[in-house]
Amino acid sequence: MNGYLLDTNVIRDMIRNPSGKVATHIGQIDPRAICTSVVVAAELRYGCARKGSEKLLARVESLLAIIPVLPLDVPADAEYGGIRAELEIAGQPIGANELLIAAHACALGLTLVTDNTKVFSRIRGLAIENWLDR
């Protein structure tokens, strides 16, 4: 499967800046190539619950209704195990959600679009792009 899996920080930017860099980039590619992970959706919904903002939740739900949210499934578990072991052996562990998102992208052969390139660049074989490039 070719395409792009949008990370939490990228979707958050789309919510804050609907006409920003990410939206512009999406406008230049096939929108069917865009998706996100259920882990990202969970992080976004957690952020809304923590803020207690119905308005923000409505914006998140509206965007997630447009962007396909992919379920986490086999073979992401095998990818997760390999990635986690490799990073821990190297003394460079990352957060649990980041691991799941990376494993999801790797398992599906997707490029992870993230502003968190410092963390995700440690993962061998994970294709990453930063559409925010600050």
Indicate where each model-derived feature is located.
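Short, well-structured N-terminal submotif of metal-dependent ribonuclease cores
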Residues: 1-36, 46-62, 89, 134
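Active-site neighborhoods of divalent-metal-dependent phosphate/nucleic-acid chemistry enzymes
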Residues: 2, 58, 67-115
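Flexible glycine-rich beta->alpha loop in the catalytic core of nucleotide-sugar glycosyltransferases
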Residues: 20, 111, 118
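Nucleotide phosphate-binding site architecture
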Residues: 11-12, 42-45, 70, 121, ...
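Alpha-helix capping/helix-boundary segments
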Residues: 10-11, 40, 76, 101, ...
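Generic structural signal for small/hydrophobic residues in well-ordered secondary structure
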Residues: 7-8, 22, 44, 80, ...
